[in-house]
From Swiss-Prot:
Residues 46-72 are annotated as: Disordered. It holds the Pfam family Ribosomal_L4. This is Large ribosomal subunit protein uL4. PANTHER family: 50S RIBOSOMAL PROTEIN L4 (PTHR10746), LARGE RIBOSOMAL SUBUNIT PROTEIN UL4M (PTHR10746:SF6). It comes from Helicobacter pylori (strain G27). Keywords: Ribonucleoprotein, Ribosomal protein, RNA-binding, rRNA-binding.
């Protein structure tokens, strides 16, 4: 059974927490479907080319139908002309969103969490809180403290997951390129797959692993 590594206040390993047995044997295809759904939903769909009805000009016939030796033409907006409309071009009317049901979303999240645990990249801490130093009635060195926490983990990049994130902690991590801090309600399978390691507050971890199949 896969386990999350529990860290103390100095980010040193002090124990482990087991993932529920239902996390075992989940098909990886659920994660594939969720990633496709996530990326397609984020697609802006702004590419647009003009067809022959939308380009300007073309009000008159460019040359006589017969007698010129050239192929007949009715308008310079035809796709065969330079500056004419585009055939089968990009359109912004297409909907790229791919549907996925709640069960597949849950299975994708559980599979991604299981993968992190198997790779020993899932960590649990009691609390993620950056307070900084108060100087002249202002909180300073927030980012420095957050960076020290990240460096102590010795990971390539890290996703931090809080139960109830305060504004100072959010600000502290906002300037770190290799970190992202989110609230537990924002957690999804794509973010779990995108980062090489995950650090969760204990309350957030318990919230995620509780059985939601009966809800």
């Amino acid at each position: 059974m896969s386990k999350a590594i529990v860290l103390d206040s100095h980010l040193k390993e002090k124990g482990s927490m087991e993932l529920p047995k239902r996390y075992e044997g989940i098909n990886s295809h659920n994660l594939y479907l969720y990633v496709k759904h996530y990326l397609s939903s984020a697609r802006a769909n702004t590419a647009k080319s003009k067809n022959r009805a939308e380009v300007s000009g073309g009000g008159r016939k460019p040359w006589a139908q017969k007698g010129g030796g050239r192929a007949r033409a009715g308008s310079i907006t035809s796709p065969v002309f330079v500056g004419g409309g585009v055939s089968h071009g990009a359109t912004n009317k297409r909907n790229y969103n791919l549907k996925i049901n709640k069960k597949q979303k849950r299975l994708a999240l559980e599979y991604a969490l299981e993968e992190k645990a198997q790779a020993n990249k899932l960590f649990v801490v009691e609390k993620i809180a950056i307070k900084g130093v108060v100087e002249d009635n202002k909180r300073k060195h927030l980012t420095k403290e957050a960076n020290q926490m990240f460096q102590a983990l010795e990971q390539r990049d890290t996703l931090f997951v809080c139960m109830n994130m305060d504004e100072y902690t959010e600000l502290a991590f906002s300037n770190l390129k290799k970190c992202l801090i989110i609230d537990v309600n924002e957690l999804n399978a794509y973010l779990l797959a995108a980062f090489s390691s995950v650090v969760m507050e204990e309350a957030a971890f318990q919230h995620i692993v509780q059985d939601k199949t009966e809800e």
